[in-house]
Amino acid sequence: MGLLANNAEVVGGSIMYRGEDLLKKTEKEMQEIRGKDIAMIFQDPMTSLDPTMKIGRQIAEPLMIHKNVDKKKAWAQALEILKLVGIADAEERINDYPHQFSGGQRQRIVIAIALVCYPEILIADEPTTALDVTIQAQILNLMKELQQKIETSIIFITHDLGVVAGMADRVAVMYAGQIIEYGTVDEIFYNPKHPYTWGLLNSMPTLSSTKLEAIPGTPPDLLDPPKGDPFAARNPYAMKIDAEKQPPFFKVSDTH
């Protein structure tokens, strides 16, 4: 998204979108993509909205910038998407300010802003973390419904495996900033191959067990990453070579 501070540095890899590397785009080129083709929902809805601006204007603004529509048409489309995300009395509430909404309502508004231009990719960064369990379920159901209506792809960033099971088609498990296992949701949950994935699944509470298994040790310091496999020190199945070299990333099936 190109939203990090100027002193942030990408040390390797690429971010491919439509056959082009986003890391090579200028800020002006990214402004044409950001919010239009790729949108993002941030973690905390309480701080994601401008407190001095009516929510209708905040929803309409991306349309005026990216779709080149006039204010009246943008406002009408903002009202339509506000109804779509389930804000009651949208005709009146479109003129309200963020502080007049609850946390769950603010997250719905943030989702409306992200989806108003019908992006191809929606990045959702822990979008339900700051919400209570009941509102979490409502927001997740809303996102699944909107995904089908708008036909957008969602990259869902979360530490909640229950959310993963309910939302995902494919899952990338990350450890120390690296993808260590990738597959369909069924493969990850029912046929995991990496010891870290085993540890995550074993740490989930179940009705059939009274004991939770914890992964031993602590995560590595990413400012001073260890040589070799970053999970080796916590992996009871690690070999000596893992302390020296990264294990290869290999396929066990067409999708895993």
Question: Locations of the language-model features?
Answer:
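Short helical segment in ABC ATPase nucleotide-binding domains corresponding to the A-loop/adjacent helical element
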Residues: 16, 46, 52-65, 75, ...
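A short, proline-enriched helix->beta-strand linker immediately N-terminal to the Walker B motif
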Residues: 116-120
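ABC ATPase nucleotide-binding domain helical subdomain, centered on the C-loop/LSGGQ "ABC signature"
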Residues: 68, 72-87, 94-95, 190, ...
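Conserved ABC transporter NBD signature motif
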Residues: 10-21
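Conserved ABC ATPase signature
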Residues: 96-101, 105
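Short catalytic/signature loops enriched in Gly
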Residues: 7, 88-91, 182-256
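P-loop NTP-binding/switch modules centered on Walker-like glycine-rich loops
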Residues: 2, 123, 127, 131-213
